[in-house]
């Protein structure tokens, strides 16, 4: 069993973290890119078989996405399960979690993972039935974060949120109609940030299980932000308060 990853950053990040997972790599024939050369040398030094391929082959393997002239076939990484969450929480005095409710676009999932990694989030939680898959597109956008931040899919998000509350984790949800902003919120301790789907927001049951609702103040004419942008803003305000 194997999976494909593509893009310079995604391949490089996995090679640095888990070179043993690589089975083979495909490089665009005739591609002269200074960014690719060090990566090719690094792959060769790890004994990875490298094959030259035409653009049509790479486009097909990446479903027409921007692959930057490199694709790798790798062994699947660790798949975190719902029952791994308590152990992950126990590793930290102040767990810092991100919950994505209804983020179904793999580009947004990848961007949220990238922001989560940069902010030091310990795990990202998503519902099994209403979330984008962690496919090659999401991994490319994540620029390596998909290999470092545990992504946990849960069967019942509301039940998981209750479990977090039993672990004394404060759950902060985002909603445009919230009566105070993230800058008025207190987020220095054990916490989980909940982001809803773009346009729709959190589902009713998810919202009801939040301890607090916050909004992002908007000064211009637009009514909302892309979910990955909003996630980054909220995460780094939490980081500011936690440091």
UniProtKB/Swiss-Prot annotation:
Its EC number is 2.1.1.185. GO terms for molecular function: RNA binding; rRNA (guanosine-2'-O-)-methyltransferase activity. Pfam families: SpoU_methylase, SpoU_sub_bind. GO terms for cellular component: cytosol. CDD domains: SpoU-like_RlmB. It catalyses: guanosine(2251) in 23S rRNA + S-adenosyl-L-methionine = 2'-O-methylguanosine(2251) in 23S rRNA + S-adenosyl-L-homocysteine + H(+). It is found in: Cytoplasm. Belongs to the class IV-like SAM-binding methyltransferase superfamily. RNA methyltransferase TrmH family. RlmB subfamily. Specifically methylates the ribose of guanosine 2251 in 23S rRNA. HAMAP family: 23SrRNA_methyltr_B. This is 23S rRNA (guanosine-2'-O-)-methyltransferase RlmB.
